[in-house]
Structures are given as C-alpha cells and as structure tokens.
Amino acid sequence: DEHEIFVEEAQTEKELVEGAGLRYKRIAATDHIWPLPAAVDEFVQFYKSLPENIWLHFHCQAGEGRTTEFLAMYDILKNPAVPLQDILYRQCLLGGSYVAHVEPEDSTYWKVPYYVEKAKHIALFYRYVQENEGTGFAVSWSDWIAAHELDDDADE
C-alpha cells in the first residue's frame, strides 16, 4: 500500500539532538501550572552555567504556555534592568502567551486559578532576580519563595 510507513529507527528527542552535535537539557514542568520550585532552581542553575552569547531553543508540547514561562524567566535573568511588563509584552509579541494574564474574577474557565498562580509567581520571580542577581543567586528560588510565600500568607 502506498500509504504505509515503516519506522526504521526510533530515537528520543535527546538522542536526536545530541546525535546532531548539540547539547540537550530537559526540565520537567506540568502544563498549565507554574513550575515546581525544584524545576525553577534547576533552570536558574542551568542559566548560571551558560556561556556568553549562547543560542537556546525552548519548547513544550504546544510551544506556548511552558515555553513562554521559561522564555520569560530567561529574559528576566538575562535582562534584570528591563521592567517586568516590557519583558512579558515582548514574549507575548514574539508569539508566546501572556504569562501574567488573569481572567475576570467571575470567570468559570477552569484555568483561572492557574493563571492567577502564574501571574503571581512571574512577578515574584522578577523580584527574586532583582534581589539575588548581585550575589549570583546564592539564595535558591526554593528557599526564597518559601520565605516569601510565608510572608504573603501572613499578610492575608
């Protein structure tokens, strides 16, 4: 049959990328929600290990949510003097989602709680970078966010 396809070789994404002579880094993150603190720590450590003027390729399944979250975090790390709103607009204009998007309070859309968390955490990540980039991020995101979420809980 002319429409049959025979798989002659199967590779993981990592095998394919490394087979082309490139380096591969995967950071696990669940779709629709802000990454776990350990994933953000891993990303910050990865960022710190990068040489100057490196090219990176980011993607998730759809190329929007998680991709834009990590691109925004990378942009924040790379450009700490740029206002957060400018970074988020830039990432959106480049084709990503708007990470600080929040639906109206009366919305029944199932993703609303996740949007609220993302908007809160991208602002906190920006603040984390502002406070810690001068020390080379001696304080991990996990430690920093644990202390600041406790502060936020006390304020409520």
Spans of model-derived segments:
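PTP/DSP superfamily signal
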Residues: 3, 15-57, 62-156
